[in-house]
Amino acid sequence: RRRQRQMCIRDSNSIGQVLLARRMGKRRIIAETGAGQHGVATATVCALMNMECIVYMGKTDVERQRVNVEKMKMLGATVVPVTSGNMTLKDATNEAIRDWCCHPSDTYYVIGSTVGPHPYPDMVARLQSVISEEIRKQLLEHEGRECPDYLIACVGGGSNAAGTIYHYVNDPHVQIVLAEAGGKGIETGMTAATIALGKMGIIHGSRTYVIQNEDGQIEEPYSISAGLDYPGIGPMHANLAKQKRAIVLAVNDDEAIRAAYELTRLEGIIPALESAHALGALEKMKFKPTDVVVLTVSGRGDKDIETYLSDE
């Protein structure tokens, strides 16, 4: 039967992990979410499989992503607002991990990005690799080749970027461009530009770049985008940046908003704020007329309409 899809790129990750949880005999599913997309995807799968679903979400994000919160509730999930710290994605992840540690026998934690302890970063990247599989198929159909010249994706934790580049990482002819959240500007302190400002550290079980102070304490990140508002980065992306395999650009809030409006007016596509950062990277790049450029628009902008209108 055809079912209306509640989500897009997040589905494959949630489906894979919930199926794994069921195989392991777990009855209770927990997840964290920032923009709410991963929460909706996980709640959808749990509804289909008749499994309990608890989603942790920072109180700040609950308020700015009300549409997705209501979707999760309609799907039968319990949404737990997190009031610690900056009340955003990092804090939601903290609470989800605490829950997981307290209920190891019956609970499975569906992590939404390429973060957390092994094997989560690798597992999420593999499940999201359907994105690059689809890119290869569409390029072959429309361009007569499987490889683009450039791949562009936004990065917070990095799940959609990992899926976008998965089958191209070892191809030196494909230039990878990662757009992270510059916030109000990387020099202002109100930013989530982890690769630009971060130092090597540990966050949620991963060794990666982390925004931290001189004492090693994790700093509170900021981004207009709830899904990119994270002080770490997936270890895969940290390594790509360290090895100079990827170009990393910090895209500020206003640049992302401007790029989102441009896409909407030119193509009739309203992108999520997360994807708008990838679009904002376009004006920072120079391409040849013959270059084939693939940019992943990883989510719809329905959830961000109020933010777009208030920042127009």
What are these model-derived regions, one by one?
Residues 93-123, 145, 170-173, 178-269, ...:
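Active-site/ligand-binding loops adjacent to catalytic centers
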Residues 2-9:
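Short, small-residue-biased leader/transition segments that mark boundaries at the very start
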Residues 155-159, 163, 253-312:
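Claisen-condensing/thiolase-fold acyl-transfer catalytic domains that form or cleave C-C bonds
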Residues 27, 46, 51-53, 171-194, ...:
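Residues forming the flavin
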Residues 11-15, 31-49, 63-66, 154-165, ...:
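Short glycine/serine/threonine-rich phosphate/pyrophosphate-binding segments
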Residues 137-146:
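Phosphate/pyrophosphate-binding loops at sites that engage ATP/ADP/AMP, CoA/4′-phosphopantetheine
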Residues 21-58, 146-160, 176-179, 292-297:
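A short, small-residue-rich loop immediately preceding and capping a beta-strand
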Residues 19, 30, 38-96, 187-198, ...:
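Active-site-proximal loop->helix
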